[in-house]
A protein has these predicted regions:
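Small/aliphatic-rich secondary-structure junction motif
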Residues: 2-51, 100
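Hydrophobic structural packing positions in well-ordered secondary structure
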Residues: 4, 21, 97, 108, ...
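Short, conserved catalytic or interaction motifs in soluble domains
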Residues: 10, 119, 142
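Structural beta-alpha unit
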Residues: 13, 74-107, 144-145
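Short glycine/serine/threonine/alanine-rich loop segments
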Residues: 28-31, 82, 135
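General small-molecule cofactor/ligand-binding pocket signal
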Residues: 35, 85-89, 138
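A short acidic, glycine-rich active-site loop
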Residues: 52-67
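Glycine-rich, Arg-bearing micro-motifs that act as flexible, cationic patches
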Residues: 106-131, 145
Length: 145
């Protein structure tokens, strides 16, 4: 999966990361992988009547990510990445991105910019990926007023 990987979750900060990654992949003439991770629901087997299992949730997340990616590609216009692939996975977002970084040239993530005590105690996906990725990481900061 050489090229650029961008992790998205449907938030505004991940959309900014996606926009940046699309432009960077186009500049580098590199393939872009858009990765959305659906956290597993602890203690939930799924498949009960009316309730989707983890695989269904991941598939829906991939479809939503594909729509968002298509919108960003149309919005950015101009040159585009060598190729764009949208993938979904089930797991812990930081762990999945770190594992994917083994075969990447660059990982791009957004940051909520929360910082402070909550980040110290809980960590954040961007912090964990920055510290443990196997390739360079770009963290797109939140917009400032």
């Amino acid at each position: 999966m050489a090229g650029i990987i961008v992790g998205i979750d449907g938030s505004d900060h991940s959309r900014r990361a996606l926009e940046w990654a699309v432009k960077e992949a186009a500049i580098r003439h590199a393939p872009l992988t858009v990765l959305v991770v659906q956290p597993a629901i602890a203690g939930y087997a799924g498949n009960a009547v009316g309730y989707p299992g983890d695989a269904s949730l991941a598939d829906q997340a991939r479809k939503t990510a594909q729509e968002e990616t298509d919108q960003v590609l149309a919005q950015v216009g101009g040159s585009s990445p060598e190729s764009v692939t949208v993938q979904s996975a089930i797991g812990i977002p930081a762990a999945v991105l770190i594992a994917a970084s083994q075969d990447a040239d660059l990982v791009v993530v957004g940051s909520r910019g929360s910082g402070g005590f909550s980040q110290l105690v809980l960590g954040s996906v961007s912090t964990q990926v920055t510290h443990h990725a196997h390739c360079p990481v770009v963290v797109i900061p939140p917009r400032r007023p």
